[in-house]
Amino acid sequence: MEHLITVHGCRTINYCGGPVTNGENLLRLKAYRDCLLRHGIPYEEKRVYHYNYEMESGIRIFDHFREADLIPDAFVCANDNIAVGLATRARETGFRIPDDFLITGFDNHDKASYF
């Protein structure tokens, strides 16, 4: 996230998380919140959505943010499966990555390198 803020100038960043009861997800959410606050960006609950760690979760999460008119400068995804699903749905609905927004995942899976 530091890179998204300091290099790319992102000011609206949505967190696409896994299960709200998952310990790793909660640590990533805390890091997201802490980074925003360090850079003077307000934490907004409406920019956070939890589901699961599957690719289909990224599709659901993107649809949620699009329907709520909350497309950010960047999406920070709790894992690469979510990021791939999100990127897939974004492209299906006419968005251009990275022109319209940036997406980052977590885990460094091979399939994410194609996005």
Task: Identify the residue ranges that each predicted region occupies.
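Bacterial carbohydrate/catabolite-sensing allosteric modules
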Residues: 1-115
